[in-house]
A protein has these predicted regions:
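Alpha-helical transmembrane segments of multi-pass membrane transport proteins
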Residues: 1-249
Length: 249
């Protein structure tokens, strides 16, 4: 187009240099973390979402409106794995919204709390949004992750507080309180899922590996526990996960 042809003339740059500059803008190792975190999130959404929800429900299911609170907690945990709001609302909201509607929660509230909780994904590290921002501005992605921890936790607490308030005000249903033995069994079953955000964030903040390396570790860990621990994913499922991740990326 004419605008494309006039761009190098306006900047007194030859086309070769312009092409190099365009490539240099995308030539960042930090950006490699994005497809890896998306892939890890998609793998885990097929495997561990139910585990995270089950653990959350085991501890707080006895509170009125507990499913809304479980949605917030599970979204925070899943956000610490995928770094994506879309993946979070798809994985967690896709499970908890139908469950809330089945227990006669107002449909608008169920959709709203799941949507709001999903924004924890782009805030709580490893946030894909922060990876892109750091790549563009040259700011350390690890420092961005560290700076987003407190805002993410505060937002999760605000959402949890509102879920508690709404549940008590509207007398929403609660589940039976679990015994310590039942809670221990649920945690034991889902402990591998809980370890994933610990490995990712602990490795980054502990200086063990970079955000990009942590994303690769997350994919390997997700594959290992999905295929060999929980055994709830097949190679056929992996193919569809790879396609979905490519589209999302």
């Amino acid at each position: 187009s004419r605008s494309a042809k006039s761009l190098p003339l306006c900047q007194d740059l030859p086309f070769e240099i312009l092409a190099q500059k365009m490539f240099a803008g995308m030539n960042s190792s930090s950006l490699l973390a994005i497809p890896f975190f998306i892939l890890a999130g998609n793998i885990m959404s097929r495997s561990i979402t139910g585990k995270l929800i089950g653990i959350s429900n085991a501890f707080i299911g006895w509170i009125k409106g507990s499913l809304a609170l479980v949605t917030v907690v599970a979204s925070a945990l899943f956000g610490a794995i995928s770094g994506s709001g879309v993946a979070t609302v798809s994985a967690v909201g896709g499970t908890t919204i139908p469950a809330m509607k089945e227990e006669k929660y107002p449909a608008h509230f169920a959709a709203a709390i799941a949507s709001m909780a999903s924004i924890l994904g782009p805030i709580i590290p490893p946030s894909i949004t922060l990876i892109v921002y750091g790549s563009i501005t040259g700011v350390s992605v690890s420092k961005l992750f560290l700076g987003s921890v407190i805002p993410g936790v505060l937002l999760a607490l605000v959402l949890a507080g509102y879920a508690l308030f709404y549940g008590k005000k509207h007398d929403l249903p609660a589940h039976k309180r679990r015994s310590p033995k039942e809670i221990a069994c649920t945690v034991k079953d889902g402990i591998w899922a809980l370890l994933m955000p610990v490995i990712i964030l602990g490795g980054i903040f502990g200086g063990i590996f970079s955000p990009t390396e942590s994303a690769a570790v997350a994919v390997i860990y997700a594959l290992l526990i999905s295929f060999f621990v929980y055994k709830d994913m097949s190679f056929k499922d992996l193919g569809s996960v790879l396609i979905d991740s490519s589209i999302s990326t």
